UniProtKB/Swiss-Prot annotation:
Stimuli inducing this protein: Target of TAS1 (trans-acting siRNA precursor 1)-derived small interfering RNAs in response to temperature variations, thus reducing both basal and acquired thermotolerance. Up-regulated by cold (at 4 degrees Celsius). Repressed by trans-acting small interfering RNA (ta-siRNAs) siR850/siRNA255-mediated transcript cleavage. Highly up-regulated in seedlings exposed to heat shock. Induced by HSFA1s-mediated (e.g. HSFA1A, HSFA1B, and HSFA1D) promoter activation.
Entry's Gene Ontology BP terms: heat acclimation; response to cold; response to heat; response to oxidative stress
The keyword Nucleus belongs to this UniProt entry's keyword annotation: yes
A GO cellular component annotation in the UniProt record: nucleus
Tissue spec. comment: Expressed ubiquitously, including in seedlings, leaves, stems, inflorescences and siliques.
Family affiliation: Belongs to the heat induced plant HTT protein family.
Keywords attached to this entry: Cytoplasm, Nucleus
Protein's job: Mediates both basal and acquired thermotolerance via HSFA1s-directed pathways (e.g. HSFA1A, HSFA1B, and HSFA1D). Triggers the expression of HSFA1A and HSFA1B.
Subcellular location: Cytoplasm; Nucleus
Organism: Arabidopsis thaliana
Protein name per the record: Protein HEAT-INDUCED TAS1 TARGET 2
Length: 252
C-alpha cells in the first residue's frame, strides 16, 4: 500500500471528526465568514427541472469541505494576500466549478484551522460544470429567485441584527444608534420575498455568531454611511443586500 492509499484509508477512519486544535479554535471564535456555508445553501437549494439530475451528485458532497479544498488548491492564500479581503460566495463557486470538490467523507469541518495533510492534493473530487451569474440589481435578483435561492451579502450592524428576533431588520436603527457598530458584510441566501408589516422584505438564511437563522430584511432601506468615520462611507446609496449571485449548473 503506497502513501496515498494509506492517507485515504486514514481519512475514512476519521470521517466526521476534526483535529482538537481546530475544535478549540472554533469554540473561541465569536464569528466567522460563512461564505463556505452559503455556497451549499445555494447549490443544494431548489433546482429547475433541467438541473434535477445534479441532486444525487450534490448530495454526495459535504458543505463542510469547501474551505479546506480552497486551502488545498493554494488559491485562498494568494487571493487573500492580493486583495486583503475575505472570500465571497462568488469566489467559492468559481473555485468549485474550476477545481471540483471532495466528497463528504473526506473532510469534517468548515474552516478547519489545522494544517492540510501532505497528500491532500490527491483527494478524489466530484467535477462541477457551470458558471456564476451575478447582478447588482435587486430587480434582476428577484427574477433569478424564481428558479432557485439567490446568494447575496448583507450589511450587518450589531446589536441591531442580534436583537431583531421575529421583526424586520433595517440596519442601523435610530433607537440603538449610539451603541450600534458596523460589523461588515456577511454572506446570506435569499429564500423568499414578500410583504411584512407593510414593507417589502426578503427572508434570508444567515450564519452569524455560529448560529444559523432566518431573518427578514427590509428592502426599501437605503443609506450612504455605514458608521462613524470616513472609511465607513459608501460611494452611492446602497441597500442592506448587495452582490447577488447564483450558480448556473451545466449538463454538458
Amino acid at each position: 500500500m503506497n502513501m496515498i492509499q494509506r492517507f485515504m484509508q486514514s481519512m475514512a477512519k476519521t470521517r466526521g471528526l476534526c483535529h482538537p486544535d481546530c475544535v478549540k479554535a472554533s469554540s473561541e471564535q465569536e464569528d466567522y465568514d460563512a461564505s463556505q456555508l452559503s455556497i451549499w445553501w445555494i447549490m443544494l437549494g431548489r433546482k429547475t427541472t433541467r438541473e434535477k439530475w445534479m441532486n444525487q451528485a450534490l448530495s454526495s458532497l459535504s458543505k463542510t469541505c469547501i474551505s479546506i479544498w480552497w486551502k488545498m488548491s493554494g488559491i485562498r492564500g494568494k487571493m487573500c494576500r492580493e486583495r486583503e479581503q475575505p472570500l465571497t460566495v462568488k469566489d467559492c463557486l468559481e473555485c468549485a466549478f474550476k477545481k471540483g470538490l471532495p466528497r463528504r467523507e473526506h473532510w469534517a469541518h468548515v474552516g478547519c484551522t489545522f494544517k492540510a495533510p501532505p497528500f491532500a492534493c490527491h483527494i478524489p473530487r466530484v467535477p462541477m460544470k457551470g458558471e456564476v451569474i451575478e447582478t447588482k440589481s435587486l430587480d434582476e435578483a428577484f427574477k433569478l429567485l424564481i428558479k432557485q435561492p439567490v446568494g447575496a451579502r448583507l450589511h450587518v450592524f450589531s446589536p441591531d441584527l442580534d436583537n431583531v428576533g421575529e421583526g424586520v431588520y433595517e440596519g442601523l436603527s435610530s433607537l440603538s444608534r449610539k451603541e450600534s457598530r458596523y460589523v461588515g458584510l456577511r454572506d446570506v441566501i435569499i429564500v423568499a420575498v414578500n410583504k411584512s408589516e407593510g414593507k417589502t422584505v426578503a427572508t434570508v438564511k444567515i450564519c452569524y455568531k455560529k448560529k444559523t437563522s432566518f431573518v427578514k430584511v427590509c428592502l426599501s432601506r437605503m443609506f450612504v454611511q455605514l458608521g462613524g468615520g470616513e472609511e465607513s462611507q459608501v460611494k452611492e446609496p446602497t441597500g442592506l443586500l448587495v452582490d447577488f449571485c447564483i450558480p448556473r449548473l451545466s449538463i454538458n
